[in-house]
């Protein structure tokens, strides 16, 4: 375990391979990751000052490379010392950089986010049971008694390299992050987390979690790190409101409706925000574009051939077809007043979909549903138009007389 507030690095590592070897593996992982992050602090400074897509990607890469280095080092030690052979560790970390954080994860340790009174799990267990549940080959009831419930499919150090999950998250004042080993979450249901958080002071939470796990069996090492994101009252209100607006707006867009909270967070990690002054064109009719826009605050007018057709307010979105191709925009969208929008670029979304295959399948299925709905609507409108035309043609001869 590591809590380094100066570096903004928080780690939980749960060693495997016997008590002594497991301790070596987890300690080696913590130290290697810390040293790599320390040597590359400039990457985090860049993200803090300017959270561009390039700086976000660099920070995610920093975390992934750090964990890969730890994996290679543990594997090397295990293969030079027969008493350590087969050792490894689960690993989860949160690296903070201003209003952004990067989660790195391998194994079955977890990160929970408590935001606005709700608990969200931001990691997915790398276990055989989790894979079977995802594939639908077992039920949750069967998982509870399965002989394979402790089988891990990924760990740091078992092989020379490992697949690392990374996730970039917003750090909003009032948020609470809980990093823990399976020694805790194995005795704790997700829906119990918020009541426990509300029932204890922040300083007492780790002890409260550990006592609960011990009371319920405590068969494994129990580790928990609790992190609270602070800010002044003004910043807290504004940042919380905007973070909530971004997530709520994303949930309402049909393209993202089947995604989990973790997957929606991944989409938000590739989104950017921008404020347009009143009267400024956001997209221009006839010009190519590749971004989806979501109105976070303010109003926009949709115009075609200089005529206003509609108005969108907070939560409205436009330009989604730009995610599919580079066709010219069919209308101009203009800010009616100072307006803040969230933008998702096609290439950034495609890169995310390449990394997250399940997310990609869900989005493609949603896109097919959207196209199907639009096709039905178009067919219905065409049918109505044909009927109206038939009536006009039938009446026309009599009108001429």
Residue map of PLM features:
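Short alpha-helix capping/helix-loop boundary micro-motifs
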Residues: 162-165, 288, 305
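PP2C/PPM-type serine/threonine phosphatase catalytic domain
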Residues: 1-276, 296, 327, 368-369, ...
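Conserved short histidine dyad/triad with adjacent acidic residue
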Residues: 260, 272-287, 311-314
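A small-molecule sensor/coupling module
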Residues: 264, 349-389
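Cyclic-nucleotide recognition modules
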Residues: 310-365
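Glycine- and acidic-residue-biased ligand/ion/polar-headgroup-sensing regions
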Residues: 279, 290-305, 314-316
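Phosphate-/nucleic-acid-contacting segments
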Residues: 385-401
